[in-house]
């Protein structure tokens, strides 16, 4: 039975306030779950490249001694970070046996090292602070977070931000086959959680904003018919989605379907629904219906990720 399988999340931490929000989110939602494990990883930065090269101004013995001292210091800092993070999770309800730690030395860049560990460890998701790891922070969003969601990895990425933590989950999906991966992921992670409230949300856009004035007279006449067929297709899709979620032993009143028609801005409608409904977590796919593989992050997903603050966003490949 799916509910008996263990869920294992890789939490990337650098000891920053953003990283602590990730720990708070994980502990609030999953500490009481006996089928949930966490591995905390911290990436120790490498020795500066100029010290890796022969330097005529620096004696070789002294150079290597300095390299070893810096490596040891960086690794110890990474170890201290994961130890403190584990102490936080344990103090907030996680049994020590379900919290593991790893301190790793940076080999490529931080995002690639995290994804490599995620693939090798076969984790169910990677959780990271929305604004990224402090050492790699960027002006718009932490570059580590951005690289993680832009990667072609199949590992879902959880971007954690803000203080809104509750058991309300908004699954923003269109009718593409890849969207079933979003439902599968959420259903697997939350299976058996009697407190979870799940809303399957689909937005059907209006044709009118894209019509020229002289075309609206003709195409506007069929818009109602097209939207009706789209709505019927959406309801059939969500009936199938509900069957998938039903395998997680959710009760009928835990899962609802919400369809919005006539939208002029799909991303804005998803953001508004998340805020108005006070959802603590929004789950969506990297690419939407008709998305090209070359476009790793779809337009709607990008707008939601950048526009929705103070929530957790699960980005599923």
Q: Could you describe each region identified by the protein language model?
A:
Residues 1-5, 72, 76, 83-126, ...:
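Structural beta-alpha unit
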Residues 2-68, 165-224, 243-256:
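Small/aliphatic-rich secondary-structure junction motif
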Residues 4-5, 25, 31-32, 112-165, ...:
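Gly/Ser-rich helix-loop-strand patches that form or flank binding pockets
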Residues 11, 38-40, 89, 123-126, ...:
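Short, structured motif recognition centered on aromatic/hydrophobic residues
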Residues 36, 97, 155, 196, ...:
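A structural micro-motif
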Residues 42, 103-105, 202, 259, ...:
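Residue-level recognition of beta-strand->loop/alpha-helix junctions
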Residues 63-80, 220-236:
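A short acidic, glycine-rich active-site loop
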Residues 81-82, 114, 183, 237-238:
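Fold-core signature of tandem repeat domains
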């Amino acid at each position: 039975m799916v509910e008996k399988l263990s869920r294992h999340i890789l939490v990337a931490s650098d000891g920053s306030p953003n990283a602590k929000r990730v720990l708070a989110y994980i502990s609030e939602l999953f500490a009481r779950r006996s089928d949930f494990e966490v591995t905390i990883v911290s990436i120790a930065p490498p020795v500066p490249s100029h010290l890796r090269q022969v330097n005529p101004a620096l004696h070789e013995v002294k150079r290597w001694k300095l390299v070893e001292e810096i490596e040891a210091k960086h690794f110890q800092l990474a170890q201290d970070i994961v130890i403190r993070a584990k102490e936080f999770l344990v103090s907030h309800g996680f049994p020590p046996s379900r919290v593991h730690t790893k301190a790793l030395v940076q080999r490529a860049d931080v995002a690639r090292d995290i994804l490599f560990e995620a693939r090798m460890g076969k984790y169910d998701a990677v959780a990271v602070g929305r604004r990224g790891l402090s050492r790699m922070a960027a002006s718009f969003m932490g570059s580590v977070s951005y690289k993680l969601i832009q990667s072609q990895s199949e590992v879902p990425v959880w971007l954690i931000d803000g203080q809104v933590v509750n058991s309300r989950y908004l699954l923003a999906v269109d009718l593409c086959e890849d969207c079933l991966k979003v439902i599968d992921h959420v259903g697997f992670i939350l299976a058996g959680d009697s407190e979870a409230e799940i809303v399957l949300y689909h937005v059907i856009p209006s044709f009118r904003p894209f019509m020229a004035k002289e075309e609206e007279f003709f195409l506007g006449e069929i818009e109602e018919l097209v939207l009706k067929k789209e709505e019927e297709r959406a309801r059939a899709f969500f009936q199938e989605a509900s069957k998938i979620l039903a395998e997680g032993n959710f009760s009928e009143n835990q899962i609802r379907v919400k369809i919005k028609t006539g939208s002029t801005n799909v991303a804005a409608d998803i953001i508004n629904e998340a805020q108005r409904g006070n959802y603590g977590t929004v789950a969506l796919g990297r690419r939407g219906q008709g998305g090209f593989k070359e476009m790793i992050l779809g337009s709607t997903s990008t707008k939601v990720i950048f526009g929705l603050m103070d929530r957790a966003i699960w980005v599923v490949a």
